[in-house]
A protein has these predicted regions:
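Extended, charged catalytic domains and RNA/DNA-binding interfaces, predominantly
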Residues: 1-266
């Protein structure tokens, strides 16, 4: 994390940055080290400075298997660095991400793998240490207020509304930024923002949204859809003057190849 601070200050010359590691993979030790490192980053040569402003945060990394269950990822960023104004613990997302890291009976590298690849043995050993540390943290009771939970347990929220509620129970009002909403590895096709605009999902707490990243972009709302119909039996949308669905374009490419091979359109 010190490298990230130095890069922000001396290389990229950005005005501010935030650490937002995945909450599902965090532990009490990592969270404390994160807070300590960010506080140290706010100092230069032993004096507090504002040449670059670092923020403490975490990522709520929700993955749903269907569009109805998928809410996506949220970066949670806190304005202040004082202990009382930070979450007692990162709050992870229930479901796929938590189950994969914490509840999966597999996941550890068998010792034989490190032996067979002896030059990289330390990497395998470090991975197993990482997984074991995560899984050794007990899950917080779900029926207690977030403010009353121990700082050494793992807390998770199933929905954006639940996430906001738990933060409010600690009297916290951080910046929450939805991001990574493009279809692909963790976002089921036909997913949309519709269900997240309902009042119980607390959309008023998410005042800005990521519009571009390495995952893709979500810069503007458009009324058309890539696919229509049931997810198990999807139908490609027809093109419009403003939009050519990728599935339709794929069909055009296949058709052209068939015609070049002398096949008929039928």
């Amino acid at each position: 994390m010190a490298d990230a601070c130095d890069y922000a200050r001396y290389c990229s010359s950005i005005d501010f940055w935030a650490i937002t590691d995945h909450a599902e993979a965090s532990t009490p030790r990592k969270w404390q080290e994160t807070k300590d490192s960010i506080r140290q980053c706010s100092f230069k040569n032993g004096k507090e400075t504002n040449d670059v402003i670092p923020f403490v945060g975490f990522e709520w990394t929700q993955v749903g298997p269907t569009p109805e269950e998928h809410y996506g990822h949220k970066n949670v960023i806190f304005k202040d660095l004082e202990e009382s104004k930070l979450s007692k613990r990162p709050i992870g997302a229930g479901g796929t991400a938590t189950n994969a890291l914490r509840n999966n009976t597999g996941g550890l590298m068998p010792p034989i793998v490190g032996i067979l690849d002896i030059l990289n043995f330390q990497d395998y050993s470090d991975f197993n240490y990482f997984i074991n540390e995560v899984r050794d943290i007990p899950t917080c009771p779900k029926n207690k207020s977030s403010a009353d939970l121990s700082s050494d347990c793992y807390e998770f929220a199933d929905t954006p509304g639940d996430l906001v509620r738990r933060l409010e129970e600690q009297n916290l009002d951080p910046l929450i930024i939805p991001h990574g909403s493009t279809w692909g590895f963790y976002t089921p096709p036909s997913s949309s923002w519709d269900k997240q605009l309902k009042s119980d999902m607390r959309p008023e707490k998410m005042k800005i949204i990521e519009v571009m990243s390495g995952h893709g972009n979500a810069e503007e709302f458009r009324s058309y859809q890539q696919i229509i119909g049931d997810l198990n039996n999807p139908v490609c949308s027809k093109p419009t003057s403003e939009f050519l669905p990728s599935c339709w374009r794929a069909g055009q490419i296949i058709e052209n190849r068939c015609l070049q091979e002398g096949l008929s359109k039928d």
